[in-house]
Amino acid sequence: MNQADAWKLRSSRYEAVQFSREINKQLSELRPDNVMGAIYIAKDYAVIAACTLATLCVSWWLYPLAVLLIGAYQRGLTTIAHDAAHRTLAKNTTWNYVLGILFAAYPLFQRHWAYRISHVYLHHPYLGDPEKDPDLKFFMANGVYDVQPPKRYAFNIIWKPIFGGATLAYLKYLWTNRFSITDSEDQSRSSILVDKYGFYLFWIGILAGSYALGLLHIVILFWIVPYLTTFQVLGWFVELAEHSPMCESETKNVYLTRNRKGNFLERAILGQNLDEYHLEHHLSPGIPFWLLHKAQKIRMQDPGYAKVAASWGGLFVKGPQGQPSVITQLKERNRRLYEQSLADAHAKGHVA
């Protein structure tokens, strides 16, 4: 068996679990303001600047660490662009656009409307549909759901991406779903064109300005290089952890994604800007990222949700009570299906 075929959400919508009126009332109070998004942006750029200055002023031996940390905080800026696409980064709509587009989307070579179309209009409503969910289609096309010999599977989804083997595929995914996609009937063509030419003007200004100031090499070494290396690697694993392998067999929204419970180091590298609260986001996309941990605490009043929450681990590491990591779950699923395929082939051989 090369491809799992138990896709229950093909051409159908997931079932939304209902919470009590009291829980929903508490959740409704979690709304964006006009300050916190800007504070998180300032934090991200402050760390990136600190990494740059430490390398330039202390030692170039710090450069590999700087590239890792800058990539991690660039990934954090993805959360900023993401919330702007959902219009939850700031209460004021114009401020939401300014923060999300100029300080996150454009610097990460993404366009706001492309992000909104692929994520808000395609990923969220068609979550788990192997024909319409762009995120799921990407990981299916790149072998995450293929059943392979266990060592080969581990190499393909873990070691190969760590050493850059999935970077071109992930870049193509970003190009398609975060930059070039425009096919949405409910968006004005003028907004998309403004976004498109605004992106080009932004980068012309950055490159021309840095060249004029003699800082072009700084932009390349401390922004472009991390973006093309660690940002891509971290992006692969973070997005892998959001829904894999749950979309293959689940139909209820609380089982289609997860919050992650990694340790401090894993959260520092793979969870900037509370990136680990992905289930909370899908359950309440109108809540800004900095309040998702409060949303989880509110939902923990529901016994069914609390039971689901007790099953989560980290991405690479076990959870606080020994819950299996995402990587362990993926490897175990592949091992089980691979052994099943061998047993089926053996049985057919005996029948023949």
From Swiss-Prot:
Role played: Involved in the biosynthesis of the nodulation enhancer compound rhizobitoxine. Catalyzes the final step of the pathway, the introduction of a carbon double bond into the C3 position of dihydrorhizobitoxine to produce rhizobitoxine.
Source species: Bradyrhizobium elkanii
Cellular component terms (Gene Ontology): plasma membrane
Catalysed reactions, as listed in the record: dihydrorhizobitoxine + 2 reduced [2Fe-2S]-[ferredoxin] + O2 + 2 H(+) = rhizobitoxine + 2 oxidized [2Fe-2S]-[ferredoxin] + 2 H2O
CDD domains reported for this sequence: Rhizobitoxine-FADS-like
Record flagged with keyword Lipoprotein: no
Family: Belongs to the fatty acid desaturase type 1 family.
Keyword Ribonucleoprotein in record: no
PANTHER family hit by this protein: DELTA(5) FATTY ACID DESATURASE C-RELATED, FATTY ACID DESATURASE 2
Keywords on record: Cell inner membrane, Cell membrane, Membrane, Oxidoreductase, Transmembrane, Transmembrane helix
Membrane topology: Multi-pass membrane protein
EC number: 1.14.19.61
Location in or out of the cell: Cell inner membrane
Domain of life: Bacteria
Name listed for the protein in its UniProt record: Dihydrorhizobitoxine desaturase
Sequence intervals crossing the membrane: 53-73, 89-109, 204-224
InterPro entries recorded: FA_desaturase_dom, Fatty_acid_desaturase
Record note on disruption phenotype: Mutant can produce serinol and dihydrorhizobitoxine, but not rhizobitoxine. Mutant produces no symptoms of foliar chlorosis on G.max cv. Lee and does not accumulate rhizobitoxine in the nodules or upper shoots. It shows significantly less nodulation competitiveness than the wild-type strain on M.atropurpureum.
GO molecular function, one term: oxidoreductase activity, acting on paired donors, with oxidation of a pair of donors resulting in the reduction of molecular oxygen to two molecules of water
